[in-house]
Amino acid sequence: MQKLVAIKGMNDILPPDSARWEWLEDKVRTLMARYAYRNIRTPIVEPTPLFVRGLGEVTDIVEKEMYSFEDRLNGEQLTLRPEATAGVVRAVVEHSMLYDGGKRLYYMGPMFRHERPQRGRYRQFHQIGAEALGFPGAEADAEIILLAHALWAELGLENVRLELNSLGQPDERRAHRAALIAYLEQHMDVLDEDARRRLHSNPLRILDTKNPAMQALVEGAPRLIDFLGEASLQHFETVKAILDANGVVWSLNPRLVRGMDYYNLTVFEFVTDQLGSQGTICGGGRYDYLIEQIGGKSAPAVGWALGVERVLELLKEQEAQVARPAADAYAVVPDASALPVVMATLQRLRAQGVSVQMHSSTAAGEGMGSMKSQFKKADASGARYALVFGADELARGAVTVKPLRDSGEQAERPLAALAEWAATLQSSR
C-alpha cells in the first residue's frame, strides 16, 4: 500500500517546533491587546468572486495562484483563501460591524496559494494580520505601522527595514498610469512577456518586476509620488512625521506597489536581507475603497499581514531566544500500584495551574521502568522539578521534590501540603 504523505508545500508543524509558533502567537496576542485590537476568525473557504472583485482580476494571485473549485452541491465557485483581508472585510460588511464606529481587528491562520514551494514560500502558509477599519486619518496608518514595529522589538528581531510609498488616490493613479504606459511603450524591446501582457491592464505591477534586465528601465519610469495632489501628500507627510517622532527609521521606495489592487495612499513593507528573495516579512497599506467594492457602505481602512513562516525563519537566522515551554514537574513513579494516588495528586496540582508530565509505563504489563531511566527522561523533558512517588514516601503520605534546574536541595513534602508548594512555584516563574 502506498504511503500517504502531506501535499508538497503544505507542512506539518510538529513539536518541539510548534512551541516556537505558540510563543510567537502569544507575543502577538499580548501586543494586540495593548493596542486594543480584537480577534476575528473567518472561514478558510470563501466565494471566489470575493477575491476576484477585492484583489483585482489581473493580479498574480487571482490569475495564477488561487485554489478554486466548484461546490458539488450547488455549483457555487469557491476558493481557499489566498489572503485574509478580503474575508475580514466581507465579515465586517455582512455583520454591519461598523454601525457604531471603527473597529481594530487582528487574525491568525492558514492561507493557500498554488505556487512552486521554496524557502519562505509555501502552498499552505500562515499569516498574522491587523486591520483598522473605519479610521480615515493618517494617524491610523502610522499607528498600525508602529504596531508592527513594536512586534519586532517584542520578538527580538533586528535588521528589519521599513520601506514606504504612497499610491495616492484613483484620479492621481490614472494620470500616472497614462504617463507610465507612454514611457513603457517607448521601450517595448526591453519589456519581457509578462510586462507586455500587463502593459495596458495593470502597468503599475511592472514596477515590481524581479527581472534584472528591466531594472534600469523601471528605475527611470515616472514616479507615482510625483503625481500626488496636496491632500495625498499631506496625508503621507503626517504618517512620516509620526514615525519620525517615534524614532522609526524608514526609507522611500517609489517602486513599492504591493500585490493587490485594493490599496491607495500609504503602502509599506518591512524587509530583511537575511531571507534571500523572500525578504518581505510584513506588508500592508490603506484600502479606502475595498469595503464599498465588496458591497458595503464606503468606509476607510488600513492594515498589514506578516508571514509567520518567514518571521520564524528570520528568528532562527538571527538566533533569537525563543522560549520553549517545559513542564514545571515530572512525576517519577517506581511502582505502578501507586498510580491511583499519583494521578489524583497530579490532577490537584494541574487544577492549581502547575504543569506536570507523568512518566508512562514502558509497555503493557512491564511496569514503570527503572528509577535511573525515569530520572533521565525527567531531565530530558526540561522540567524544573522531579516529583518522586516512592513506596516509602507514599507510606508516609509524602512525595520527594527534587530540583532539576533550580538551586536547592531535594526535600520531602506531605501530599497534603503540595498546594503551598504549587503556590510558591507559580510565584517564582
Swiss-Prot record:
GO annotation, biological process: histidyl-tRNA aminoacylation
EC number per UniProt: 6.1.1.21
Pfam families linked: HGTP_anticodon, tRNA-synt_His
Highest taxon above the source species: Bacteria
Reactions catalysed: tRNA(His) + L-histidine + ATP = L-histidyl-tRNA(His) + AMP + diphosphate + H(+)
GO annotations of cellular component type: cytoplasm
GO molecular function: ATP binding; histidine-tRNA ligase activity
Matches recorded under InterPro entries: aa-tRNA-synth_II (IPR006195), aa-tRNA-synth_II/BPL/LPL (IPR045864), Anticodon-bd (IPR004154), Anticodon-bd_dom_sf (IPR036621), His-tRNA-ligase (IPR015807), HisRS-like_core (IPR041715), HisRS/HisZ (IPR004516)
Enzyme class: ligase
SUPFAM superfamilies for the chain: Class II aaRS ABD-related (SSF52954), Class II aaRS and biotin synthetases (SSF55681)
PROSITE patterns the record matches: AA_TRNA_LIGASE_II (PS50862)
Signal sequence region: none
NCBIfam families xrefs: hisS (TIGR00442)
PANTHER family, per database record: HISTIDINE--TRNA LIGASE, MITOCHONDRIAL-RELATED (PTHR43707:SF1), HISTIDYL-TRNA SYNTHETASE (PTHR43707)
Subunit note: Homodimer.
Family per record: Belongs to the class-II aminoacyl-tRNA synthetase family.
Protein name as it appears in the record: Histidine--tRNA ligase
